[in-house]
A protein has these predicted regions:
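Patatin-like phospholipase
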Residues: 1-202
Length: 202
């Protein structure tokens, strides 16, 4: 089923259909992001139409990658909730987002630390928080999530070192053993606390 049709059927954060007599089957290994999109829509009421994110009270843009051609896509206008959802569509974890003729996933594939985008927006001071994972060793590549995360890390390294140099303040919290799939409340609270500690250490 094309993703444009698949998205119409997404109902839950984790969409796991029952297929008669065959038990539970996960569609294409993807997690539906409909509930996340609904949450973003509630949080961004008033910014659902075609708006320039650069004119928001706090100017904003985010980065996605187009699976059709592999190119970086800077999202700085349109539907704010949809842009946010597109930029966090981690390959192999969340389903891609169809936007016009593009199939968008997490921008980490093309630009995993987009300080250059902030610089282009006119930022005077850049505080970069790096939550990328260290590359895993062979014995640590055991699950689909770990393999996809490793591939994403490789693909997003093209600009990585140069973009670190653009930071006025560079913060890298300790995120071990957490990953992009760490969504529990306990995981999130722990990561926030580690981020605060890393920032205060600067």
């Amino acid at each position: 089923m094309p993703f444009s049709e698949k998205e119409k059927d997404e109902k839950y954060l984790v969409s796991i259909p029952m297929i008669g007599g065959k038990g539970i089957q996960v569609p294409s290994g993807f997690i539906s992001g409909q509930n996340i999109y609904s949450l973003f829509s509630e949080l961004t009421i008033g910014y659902h139409d075609s708006v320039s994110f650069l004119n928001l009270p706090i100017p904003f843009s985010c980065v996605a990658a187009n699976l059709v051609n592999g190119k970086e896509v800077i999202l700085d206008q349109g539907n704010l909730a949809m842009a946010m959802r597109s930029s966090m569509a981690i390959p192999g974890v969340f389903s891609p987002v169809v936007m016009d003729t593009m199939l968008l996933v997490d921008g980490g594939i093309a630009n995993n630390f987009p300080t250059d985008v902030g610089k282009a927006m006119g930022a005077d001071i850049i505080i970069g928080v790096d939550v990328s994972s260290e590359l895993r060793k062979m014995n640590e590549l055991n699950t689909a999530i770990e393999i996809v995360d490793q591939l994403t890390s490789f693909m997003g390294m093209a600009k990585y070192e140069d973009n670190i140099k653009l930071c006025d303040i560079y913060i890298k919290p300790d995120i071990v053993p957490y990953s992009a799939a760490s969504f529990s409340a306990v995981d999130i609270d722990t990561l926030i606390l580690r981020g605060e500690r890393a920032a205060r250490a600067q």
